[in-house]
């Protein structure tokens, strides 16, 4: 329960401490549903109150819709009563995104994450039409995912202001990193705002974000939850300490390895097996694993 330092918009739908969960594979590269159940339970047991499935960190480009739905169903059965479940439905194909959105709605998702269409670089008119088509196709809250470093284009301010008027568009996951531009939009739109960049979690909370959607939270879920609680209770010194001592070394490691490679290697070092990434994403090599071991020890999570 919040005590008031953090924004409350959207938390009943999207949660506060979210992790964009990896998709576990077995040694043959097939979906490992049992490992998915175990990982989801581990994260929720350690303070995570929202899981984002089938997102970029879930290797959405290299998993089929059937695989996504199978993992979602298993995770919902495992932790659905204890955490919010947000499903990644966005692609660079509007029709495919609508198909996924409807399938996840039928599967019982609490909300959807829809990324800016990537690679094809549509106009802002196309971005608006894409998001509204997906949102109109389902009766679920939608979180827009603004990540121009991957999509190639941003959601521009005027487009976002128009999208905020769509009834079931309720939130933004911001991985653009432009805090100055976002600060007035958080107030003006009334949308729930979520940090999509672990290195900026504290600044986003200070600007009025409702929570975080994290990658490194896989590796240090309790620390991430503790950071949120400390900030919410007004113990900024404690939040800074957690961020500096535990989370910052993991952010640095992510910068070297990338999210999926980092998480899967780190979880293995922690004794949680989730397999290796699917190509074209590669597993960490021996040298990278040794450096990562040092990072985890420095962070106090190994």
From Swiss-Prot:
**SUPFAM superfamilies according to UniProt:** Aldolase
Provide the catalytic activity annotation. Answer: L-aspartate 4-semialdehyde + pyruvate = (2S,4S)-4-hydroxy-2,3,4,5-tetrahydrodipicolinate + H2O + H(+)
Which residues of this UniProt protein bind pyruvate? 57, 213
Identify the Gene3D superfamilies for this entry.
Aldolase class I
What SMART domains does this protein's entry cite?
Answer: DHDPS (SM01130)
Task: Choose any GO biological process term that the UniProt entry carries and state it.
Answer: lysine biosynthetic process via diaminopimelate
PROSITE patterns per UniProt: DHDPS_1, DHDPS_2
Active-site residue numbers: 145, 173
Copy the pathway line from the protein's UniProt record. Amino-acid biosynthesis; L-lysine biosynthesis via DAP pathway; (S)-tetrahydrodipicolinate from L-aspartate: step 3/4
Query: Subunit structure of this entry?
Result: Homotetramer; dimer of dimers.
Indicate what this protein is called per its UniProt record: 4-hydroxy-tetrahydrodipicolinate synthase
Origin organism is: Corynebacterium aurimucosum (strain ATCC 700975 / DSM 44827 / CIP 107346 / CN-1) (Corynebacterium nigricans)
């Amino acid at each position: 329960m919040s005590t008031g330092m953090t924004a409350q918009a959207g938390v009943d739908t999207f949660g506060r401490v979210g992790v964009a969960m990896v998709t576990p594979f077995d040694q043959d590269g097939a979906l490992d549903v049992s490992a998915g159940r175990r990982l989801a339970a581990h994260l929720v047991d350690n303070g995570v109150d929202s899981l984002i499935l089938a997102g970029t960190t879930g290797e959405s480009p290299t998993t089929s819709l059937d695989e996504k739905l199978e993992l979602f169903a298993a995770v919902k059965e495992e932790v659905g009563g204890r955490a919010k479940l947000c499903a990644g439905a966005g692609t660079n194909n509007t029709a495919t995104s609508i198909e996924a959105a409807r399938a996840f709605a039928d599967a019982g998702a609490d909300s959807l994450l829809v990324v800016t269409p990537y690679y094809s670089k549509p106009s802002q008119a196309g971005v608006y039409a894409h998001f509204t088509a997906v949102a109109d196709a389902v009766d679920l809250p939608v979180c827009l995912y603004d990540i121009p470093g991957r999509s190639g284009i941003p959601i521009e301010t005027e487009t976002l202001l128009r999208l905020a008027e769509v009834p079931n568009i309720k939130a933004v996951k911001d991985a653009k990193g432009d805090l100055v531009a976002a600060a007035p939009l958080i107030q003006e739109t009334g949308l729930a705002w979520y940090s999509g960049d672990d290195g900026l979690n504290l600044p986003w909370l200070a600007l009025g974000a409702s929570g975080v959607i994290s990658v490194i939270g896989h590796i240090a879920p309790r620390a991430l939850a503790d950071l949120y609680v400390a900030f919410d209770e007004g113990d900024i010194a404690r939040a800074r300490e957690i961020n500096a001592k535990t989370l910052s070394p993991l952010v640095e490691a992510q910068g070297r390895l990338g999210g999926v490679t980092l998480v899967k290697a780190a979880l293995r070092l922690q004794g949680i097996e989730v397999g290796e990434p699917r190509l074209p994403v590669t597993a960490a090599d021996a040298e990278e694993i040794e450096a990562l071991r040092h990072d985890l020890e420095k962070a106090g999570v190994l």
